[in-house]
Curated annotation (Swiss-Prot):
Keywords: Disulfide bond, Glycoprotein, Glycosidase, Hydrolase, Signal. A beta-D-glucoside binds at residues 52, 155, 200-201, 344, 417, 466, 473-474, 482. Belongs to the glycosyl hydrolase 1 family. This is Beta-glucosidase 45. GO terms for biological process: carbohydrate metabolic process.
Amino acid sequence: MKNLTSFVIVILLQSLLFHVYGRHQSSSKNILVDSSPFPSDFLFGTASSAYQYEGAFLTDGKSLNNWDVFTHKNPGKILDKNNADRAVDQYNRFLEDIQLMSFLGVNSYRFSISWCRILPRGRFGEINYLGIKYYNIFIDALISRGIKPFVTLNHVDYPQELEDRFQSWLNPEMQKEFGYLADICFKHFGNRVKYWTTLNEPNQQLILGYLTGKFPPSRCSSPYGNCSQGNSETEPFIAAHNMILAHAKAVNIYKTKYQKEQKGSIGIVVQTSWFEPISDSNADKEAAERAQSFYSNWILDPVIYGKYPKEMVDILGPALPQFSSNEVKNLEKSRADFVGINHYTSYFIQDCLTSACNTGHGAFKAEGYALKLDRKGNVTIGELTDVNWQHIDPTGFHKMLNYLKDRYPNMPMFITENGFGDLQKPETTDKELLNDTKRIQYMSGYLEALQAAMRDGANVKGYFVWSLLDNFEWLFGYKVRFGLFHVDLTTLKRSPKQSASWYKNYIEEHVNRRDIVDNY
């Protein structure tokens, strides 16, 4: 019996080795391709942003930004009535955080520049060289540990003075301000930064800042929100127009002045969600397409094709600004080298244009008459979570990447944010937060979906987990935790969650598989 068992084991091992190495021996590219589609230059990283991480409020010449003012004036709008004056103090603890990155084995780190550290008053004041010095030291420290900086020029925070002087993104002057910021950053950091993005999630920033008014500058009108100023059916599109042209200005500066010598690439980051028609009716299918047009395509179509989506033009008419012939030419010659995709969740979509529809998120004109729902009847769109906007639906992520692949052929993509949020309830213990099995389940499912999309032909070049650390999560304050590392809000001590070890092992496993392929 023992000999028979040994014989069976030998046969099984031979079969496995033949399966792995025996097929297509003449082409190493095919070996283990079913196991790991990640190429050798694929970026595995974590993501952050200046306001959510740095802290160091007004330190070393930093000025007030829009979120400083918003959180100080309106603490009641933040779930825990907090702000990011201290945040997780990465400004002073970045060397410790780079050690955590090294533990994970990531080869890239996505962070953003604090506009207020570099240009406290925009073009109305001087460059703050203490801010330049900080980012130079930070970038050098990352590179010394083999971690590539992946830098966002602006992640929603900007000098409050620009809001006070000319209403920031509602004014074309903001294009000049942003171009000036970009030029300074390329000049001082571009010899080491090879991956740039201009704006983070302009579509989400526009919706929350100018449509519903939940984010600064808190502008909106009924029925979209309750604000003291603003017009939800015109201002989001005016601000978007200026953001898109500001992006093009920054890209043009990089491509004409710096790219040839610095040999980097530049793109933009948008928020995406998968929108699944709630039924097989043509009306709901068309509504799902409108939902995409009024969300991610709103930004991506202009920066890639130089025009707004047809669905937006048809519904909004003259409320949607038009690009001049010169602006179209500038957009065409300032085409992004890649796009960054932030993705967390999915929704069912119900038509509200030709059908009777309840009021709710997405149901009105400026949203495309496409109602967003988390369930149809008793069936939910994936697994619902304690975070009201996040639903676990890896299949939707797979569909989203294929949709982008088909709409923007051959455009390289980076998954610049993807992660799972734990809502900290009064009864939640630190032990429960550290034992984050639900986050592991989420990441495993979404990374599997990513691999499937890459096998389908999606040109994805990197994946960044949101986030390295628990941090200030906007209106949720510190009550929603996205980090691979737990942060004690009193001591700021960083402690690895189970997901940190899981991600470390995942990276090691796929890098090792890659090495087998490359060396075979």
